[in-house]
């Protein structure tokens, strides 16, 4: 059974739900596939569900109850003649905001991450296992997501958000 909430809506008809979690990818994702029509009436979901709408996906069995399996935001809505697909992204969606161009010199990774979270409105704590200092780090025509991706690519770290805490750790290290 399921309970899927998007913005102010609760979805009844669902064709398929795929949830993908991986610390190797920056964000966890969920893909929700919905029928395009019900009782030969077009649902026009793309007019009701918008990018940035909150998404909570509860899945389970009647015997054991529902469990929150995914929480995040609608990243995009796509339609074809058969179905509507909602591509959703976890809390890292909030990092898809443009950040002001900036040049940092001699900045620790933790301080850089603090500056990054402050640039998108703050409210995050940082859990970082790395101690290094960047000689130079540039934000140029980028989003906070782009900056995190660059950090992840450079050091191979596991990067994820958990309860408003941004985690950056070596791949083999188990944290939070």
Question: Where would I find each of the regions flagged by the language model?
Answer:
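Generic solvent-exposed, charged/amphipathic alpha-helical segments
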Residues: 56, 113-117, 149-152
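Extracytoplasmic/secreted envelope proteins and their assembly/folding machinery
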Residues: 71, 110-113, 145-148
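Solvent-exposed, flexible loop/coil residues
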Residues: 15-23, 99, 108, 130
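Glycine-rich, acidic and aromatic/proline-enriched surface loops and short helix-turn segments
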Residues: 77-80, 108-125
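Short beta-strand-centered interaction patches in the first periplasmic/extracellular domains
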Residues: 83-85, 89-92, 124-176
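Assembly/oligomerization scaffold segments
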Residues: 1-94
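Second-shell loop/turn segments in exported
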Residues: 98-106, 135-138
């Amino acid at each position: 059974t399921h309970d899927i909430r998007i913005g102010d809506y609760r979805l009844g008809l669902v064709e398929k739900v795929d949830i993908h979690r991986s610390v190797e990818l920056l964000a966890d994702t969920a893909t929700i596939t919905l029928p395009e029509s019900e009782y030969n009436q077009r649902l026009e979901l793309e007019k009701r569900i918008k990018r940035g709408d909150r998404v909570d996906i509860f899945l389970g069995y009647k015997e054991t109850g529902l469990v929150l399996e995914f929480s995040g935001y609608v990243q995009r809505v796509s339609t074809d003649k058969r179905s509507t697909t909602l591509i959703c992204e976890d809390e890292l969606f909030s990092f898809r905001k443009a950040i002001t161009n900036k040049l940092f010199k001699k900045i620790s990774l933790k301080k850089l991450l603090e500056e990054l979270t402050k640039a998108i409105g703050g409210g995050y704590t940082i859990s970082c296992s790395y101690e290094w200092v960047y000689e130079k780090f540039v934000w140029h025509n980028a989003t906070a997501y782009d900056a995190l991706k660059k950090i992840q690519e450079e050091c191979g770290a596991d990067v994820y958000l958990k309860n408003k805490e941004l985690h950056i750790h070596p791949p083999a290290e188990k944290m939070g």
